[in-house]
Amino acid sequence: MMQTGSVTTPFGRRPMTLALVRRQTALADIKQGKTADKWKVFRDASAAMELLGIQSNSLAVLDALLSFHPETELRQEAQLIVFPSNAQLALRAHGMAGATLRRHIAMLVESGLIVRKDSANGKRYARKDGAGQIERAFGFDLSPLLARSEELAMMAQQVMADRAAFRMAKESLTICRRDVRKLITAAMEEGAEGDWQAVEEVYVELVGRIPRAPTLADVESILEEMWMLQEEIINRLEIRDNSENNSTNAAQSEQHIQNSKPESVNELEPRSEKEQGAKPSEIDRARSEPIKAFPLGMILKACPTIGNYGPSGAVASWRDLMSAAVVVRSMLGVSPSAYQDACEAMGPENAAAAMACILERANFINSPGGYLRDLTRRSELGKFSLGPMIMALLKASGQGTLRFG
């Protein structure tokens, strides 16, 4: 029968802690009749090794301990204390050195996977009754593995999910890096308008921030910024294409007018867009395209000054940023109507972000109100993106030498 209802303290100089007390008392709460396959539990513990704070040698010791339990299943009503000597345990742990063995036993105890059941003299043994059944044993109690079987399974699933997410994020980052690199190269080689050298520097800086051994959080953070850089590049190239198409269409229209014979005075008078046969959806398409909202964290990194004007002197949410933008608007002398127009054209979040950018370079902008109106006008025409402002501020952070406009 399984021994329950008692708390034993470690033999010798090993200290007793309240954590050990809690772990031992929790064993009494194992559900009546509960069972678990010991090797499945071992596989789950192996998968969750890093979360448990143990090492591969710790798993070798745990594997050896489980091999001393005669049954495949861990059962609530069974005897779950194993009592091998250090020599026997070291042999089954592939000849592990004594000092290493003791260190990893301590790690298994500390992680809550096993519990010591020390005898009065520290020896490991079992006392049997007249029928040869184990009456009492001293050694290592495996019942925490049974008690935590569901928890270990969930930890293993989480680790596998994180690994899958990490693989996908790394794959996405690799593809995005390739796309951005080739887009920049194409723009440079084909002489696209714009400061592509600066864009390339942003790309190189992003790649340089990838750690040698990145975590999932590292990859996701860089990937998000790389995606934004890719979108900004595509946006610049699309604006260039649209500008070229508009210039071509305008030239063709002018040539058509010059080659046509007007039949009435009305043909020389300005007409409305509807009179000219233009489709409203085409006219308003640029105005209806929403400006991409950048992550709040990136905006605050590029424009740290805005944080001083948030509620309680900090900006922790988009609502805080919009509140701070209203304060800054008044402080910089931007009229309510100019800011309202910006909110309608860009959206309130992007208008607040634009105010944060203007504040960050207020010393270099002669008329903040006029500057905001210019951004609003460009936004209405579909020719404005926050990307260049934010990327430029990130690059120039601490230098104070950049001008916009």
From Swiss-Prot:
A single GO BP term for this record reads: DNA replication
Q: Does the keyword Phosphoprotein apply?
A: no
Chain positions covered by the region annotation Disordered: 245-286
**Skewed-composition ranges (Polar residues):** 245-263
Q: Which UniProt keywords apply?
A: DNA replication, Plasmid
Query: What Pfam families does its record include?
Result: RP-C (PF03428), RP-C_C (PF11800)
User: InterPro entries in the record, alphabetically?
Assistant: RepABC_RepC (IPR047611), RepC_C (IPR021760), RepC_N (IPR005090)
| Residue stretches of biased makeup (Basic and acidic residues) | 268-286
Job description of the protein: This protein is coded by a hairy root Ri plasmid, it is probably involved in its replication.
The name on file for this protein is: Putative replication protein C
In its UniProt entry, the species of origin is given as Rhizobium rhizogenes (Agrobacterium rhizogenes)
